[in-house]
Amino acid sequence: MADKEATVFILDLGSSMGDCNSGRSESDLDWGMRYVWDKITDIVAASRKTLCVGVVALRTDGTNNKLQDDEGYEHISVLQDLGPMTMSSLRSLQDSIKPSDTSAGDAISAIVVAVDLIDTFTKKLKWIRKIVLVTDGQGAMDADDVDDISRKMNDSNIELVVLYDWS
């Protein structure tokens, strides 16, 4: 039997992600999204209910997440709750991915939102757990609780992949 996988993509949609850097003619967001779309379309093509995807947007104009009433979780929006990805949800997601008009929003807090999505969905069952953060690193980050967050990720066996361009 194939392993169950839960992957949450955190997409930095801050205004700076609309810039073109490193000599590219495409925006930083479009460059990073090539990797994300490749991974998500592979998951959709596999058509397995045990390959689950969630999408969290960072540095968004609005706020929509379970922790939004707590300080520090503003400008973070869950675009898709963790679960199987379908073609229709993929199309809907594609329409919502564009740079925002803000630079506010904390990547560390977005990771906390992603960890919460994964823990809530997978419970203590056997899953491969992964968070993929796509960012240009231009947003402010509050690293006060990073040791506790790192410990929580290790305890939950969550792998973190960071795709960035610091140009």
Label the model's feature ranges.
Residues 1-167:
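Intrinsically disordered, low-complexity, Ser/Thr/Glu/Asp/Lys/Arg-enriched terminal regions and linkers
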